Curated annotation (Swiss-Prot):
GO terms for cellular component: cytoplasm; ribosomal subunit. Coiled coil: none annotated. Component of the small ribosomal subunit. Component of the small ribosomal subunit. The ribosome is a large ribonucleoprotein complex responsible for the synthesis of proteins in the cell. Required for processing of pre-rRNA and maturation of 40S ribosomal subunits. Residues 90-100 have a biased composition (Basic and acidic residues). Keywords: Cytoplasm, Ribonucleoprotein, Ribosomal protein. This is Small ribosomal subunit protein eS24. Residues 90-132 are annotated as: Disordered. It holds the Pfam family Ribosomal_S24e. It comes from the Eukaryota. InterPro entries: eRP_eS24_sf, Ribosomal_eS24, Ribosomal_eS24_CS, Ribosomal_uL23/eL15/eS24_sf. It is found in: Cytoplasm.
Length: 132
């Protein structure tokens, strides 16, 4: 980790309902490239005395000209709460969620079966296999 990088938090809020701390993160990195999210996670984990696996950072935008990047961070009380409340795509970035991938042919067949029925019957056709 580079010493010339400063991580500041603002608009800090403790969200007791979702068991997390949420904040806006400002990263100051004058004369340097944008700091990787893993490094920001590690610095925030050290600031809040926790492990990097419960820190979720996202939405970073570097200001024109560089030197300052702003984004959001959420620090969960435990990994269970994070898995329960975080969107699946953010969990996948951390390697905590694996999306089951159906084959292209299966997806196309399902789509074409769905086109043949209308209304609420689509749910039953989409969920079940083709009945011949």
């Amino acid at each position: 980790m580079n010493d010339t990088v400063t991580v500041r938090t603002r608009k800090f809020m403790t969200n007791r309902l979702l068991q997390r701390k949420q904040m806006v993160v400002d990263v100051l990195h004058p004369g340097k490239a944008t700091v990787p999210k893993t490094e920001i996670r590690e610095k925030l984990a050290k600031m809040y005395k926790t492990t990097p696996d419960v820190v979720f950072v996202f939405g970073f935008r570097t200001q024109f000209g560089g030197g300052k990047t702003t984004g959001f961070a959420m620090v969960y009380d435990s990994l269970d709460y994070a898995k329960k409340n975080e969107p699946k795509h953010r969990l996948a970035r951390h390697g905590l969620f694996e999306k089951k991938k159906t084959s292209r042919k299966q997806r196309k067949e399902r789509k074409n079966r769905m086109k043949k029925v209308r209304g609420t019957k689509k749910a039953s056709v989409g969920a079940s296999k083709k009945k011949d």
